[in-house]
Amino acid sequence: MEEVGGNGGPARIAECGKIGSGTINSNVVPSVNLPSPSVKPSVTPSVKKPPHVIRSDYSKPREKPAKVAKKPTVKNDKKPKPVAIVAPTGIIKTFKTTPNPNRNL
């Protein structure tokens, strides 16, 4: 069912391939006879492999890409250097990481 409007009038629903109001448009084609171009009719033969070919494709091993030798990733391979923090009282304490500000020096 297509809505066909003409001469600026209200769109009417075209029934059974009839064109609605207004002048006859050569572009308007009844949708009963022709399918929309985006929908492919099921009559068209689709290219498919025979079942035995599909099974043989799965049975043979697939080619795997050559693995590139990667360096082993080591997490935290760089250890933090001890940092000397001078407290206001002059006491030197070393911390391996940033000290907790809530902790008493």
From Swiss-Prot:
Biased composition (Low complexity): 31-47
Residue ranges, compositional bias (Basic and acidic residues): 54-66
Residue ranges, annotated region (Disordered): 31-80
Protein name: Uncharacterized protein K02D10.3
Organism listed in the record: Caenorhabditis elegans
